[in-house]
């Protein structure tokens, strides 16, 4: 399965993106800070793409 990391500090935006990516068939890991994202990348080396700070 394709895995995506979402890094967004605004919870409502992050939730919207996560819900829609999951509906599209992606496995999603999410972080609210850069530190969280780095830890998630270490724990999930199979992340294929990261989406950062969506506007």
Show which residues each predicted segment covers.
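Charged docking surfaces used in two-component/phosphorelay signaling
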Residues: 15-23
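Conserved Rossmann-like nucleotide-cofactor binding loop
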Residues: 12
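Non-catalytic signal-transmission and effector/linker regions of two-component phosphorelay proteins
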Residues: 1-5
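The short loop immediately C-terminal to the conserved phospho-acceptor aspartate in CheY-like receiver
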Residues: 54-55
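Acidic, metal-coordinating helix/loop segments flanking the phosphotransfer/catalytic sites
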Residues: 30-49
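Short phosphate-binding/catalytic loops that engage adenosine nucleotides
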Residues: 26
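Conserved acidic carboxylate
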Residues: 8
């Amino acid at each position: 399965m394709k895995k995506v990391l979402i890094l967004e500090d605004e919870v409502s935006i992050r939730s919207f993106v996560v819900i829609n990516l999951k509906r599209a068939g992606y496995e999603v890991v999410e972080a609210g800070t850069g530190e969280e994202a780095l830890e998630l990348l270490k724990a999930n080396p199979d992340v294929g793409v990261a989406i950062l700070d969506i506007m």
